[in-house]
Design a protein with these regions (language model features):
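Outer-membrane beta-barrel biogenesis signature
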Residues: 20-68, 145, 157-162, 177
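Extracellular loop and loop/strand-boundary signature of outer-membrane beta-barrel proteins
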Residues: 33, 73-77, 118-125, 175-180, ...
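Residues on the lipid-exposed face of transmembrane beta-strands in outer-membrane beta-barrel proteins
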Residues: 36, 48-50, 89-93, 103, ...
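Residues that define the transmembrane beta-barrel architecture of outer-membrane proteins
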Residues: 40-42, 83-87, 127-133, 146, ...
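Repeated loop/turn-to-beta-strand initiation elements of outer-membrane beta-barrel proteins
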Residues: 44, 99-101, 145-148, 200-204, ...
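Transmembrane beta-barrel strands of outer-membrane/channel proteins
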Residues: 44-52, 103-107, 150-156, 206-210, ...
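Outer membrane beta-barrel transmembrane domains
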Residues: 59-69, 216-316
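Outer-membrane pore/translocation modules
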Residues: 107-222
């Protein structure tokens, strides 16, 4: 089971991912206050984002695993690597300062290579397709400043979950459910956030959001998760806005006969520096890099050394 069940993010919830994650794998980044609706302004916003996550590091617990020390064949799967590319269209609409809705439409491009239990050669897969769509409503009419809000919505099972290995000893066998473009489940999303200004040059946000599967599909149920995010940005120059985020995710194990229970779930904490550039009054571009500060995984899971995200946002 890939660490993507842990990663995804806040990013995938709002922009990604998925990102949350980039959809189901990758960064926990919240790439922009305004494109997420974390502002008191109304209107339409479109966001197009690309996330790149190269999961090349095999980890267990809080440490890395040297594949060279594992004699083959072995009695467990030894994953070799997973490269994830997510392209996500985000559509956000606020009819007024109190209410808003956000729709995330992800496209997943993923290559994966692993050595299955009992094998001595690697098997590979290639997955391309629409991921799980997310729709979130928000209400922020609790204060006169509209700076505190709640979020509620669903992750829908729009991505397929029947991809198989394309080459190697496992050709034709289904790949791990955690590697499929979709989970097959409908998930409930509940969150709370606050944003504001520290002074005339700095503002900040804090956010927590939980994700819980409401059902199971084909003997698989995604583990419940909690994302916690906070960020600070420097606003003195409106054309060039540097930003720093701290992102954390705690995920429980997946369950069901088709779940890799022993190799799912854990805790991730990441640091995410980035910058947003104003191209014109309505158009902004942004870029972020995310690096791990702490990783604790159950069993054996793949993790990235870093992730990268770029995107553009247009406000009507």
């Amino acid at each position: 089971m890939q660490i993507q069940r842990l990663c995804f993010i806040a990013a995938s919830i709002f922009l990604p991912a998925s990102a949350l994650a980039c959809s189901s794998c990758g960064c926990t980044l919240s790439s922009d206050w305004d494109s997420q609706g974390l502002s008191a302004s109304s209107g339409f916003r479109l966001d197009l984002r690309y996330d790149f996550i190269d999961q090349s590091q095999l980890r267990s617990g809080t440490g890395s695993v040297d594949r060279g020390n594992i004699a083959l064949p072995t009695d467990r799967e030894i994953e070799q690597g997973t490269i994830n590319r997510y392209t996500t269209l985000g559509i956000d609409y606020s009819p007024n300062a109190n209410w808003g809705v956000n729709l995330q439409l992800p496209y997943v491009d993923r290559t994966h290579q692993t050595i299955a239990e009992g094998d001595t050669m690697a098997s590979s897969s290639q997955s391309n397709g629409v991921g799980d769509v997310r729709i979130m409503a928000r209400y922020q009419g609790f204060t006169a400043q509209h700076d505190v809000g709640i979020q509620f919505g669903l992750k829908l099972p729009s991505g397929r979950h029947d991809d198989v290995f394309a080459s190697g000893p496992q050709t034709g066998e289904p790949i791990d459910r955690g590697l499929q473009p979709g989970s097959g489940t409908t998930d409930l999303l509940l969150g709370v956030y606050k944003f504001g200004a520290l002074n005339q040059d700095f503002d900040w946000f804090a956010q927590g959001i939980a994700q819980v599967a409401l059902d199971s599909r084909d003997d698989f149920r995604t583990g419940a998760s909690l994302n916690l995010n906070t960020g600070l940005r420097y606003m003195a120059n409106p054309t060039f806005t540097p930003e720093l985020q701290l992102n954390a995710r705690v995920s429980r194990r997946d369950t069901g006969a088709q779940a890799d229970v022993g190799n799912s779930g854990g805790t991730l904490i990441d640091l995410s520096p980035g910058v947003t550039a104003q191209i014109n009054r309505s158009l902004h571009a942004y870029a972020f890099m995310q690096v791990p500060l702490f990783q604790r995984v159950n069993g054996f899971q793949l993790a990235p050394h870093w992730t990268a995200s770029v995107g553009v946002r247009y406000a009507f």
